Amino acid sequence: MKKILLALFLVSSVLAFSARVVKSTELTFKNEIVYVGQEKVPYTGVVESYDEKGVLTAKAEFKDGKMNGASKIYYPNGKLGSEATFKADVQVGVQKDYYESGKLKAEVPYKNGKVDGTAKAYDENGKVIEQVTFKNGQQVK
């Protein structure tokens, strides 16, 4: 049993570290599908964007030419500014936005690409300063 678990761990580790990473400047778009350069197969892997100084500004996972997985945006100081999850180019789950200090600024729940649930905004001390409820992208009164 130990040997099987070790083999599975090694295979999953190799696969996890072999994900292809490209810069956003290498991408081309055809019918809303992402490709790298003139490749014929839709891109699967990680896309990174950098500013003119070479600082990472964004990172997103793609599968079959569509955003699929984690998407992160960074402040110029390198700290995380926002994180969201996508499935086949559709935003799902809770988007989290952060102050430059790293503290949570907002949480916005998404379902099928639309805000759905209670969105919350926080001050820098972590206190909820606003709450708004949405259903299928529409504010609930």
PLM regions and their residue ranges:
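Sec-dependent N-terminal signal peptides
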Residues: 4-13
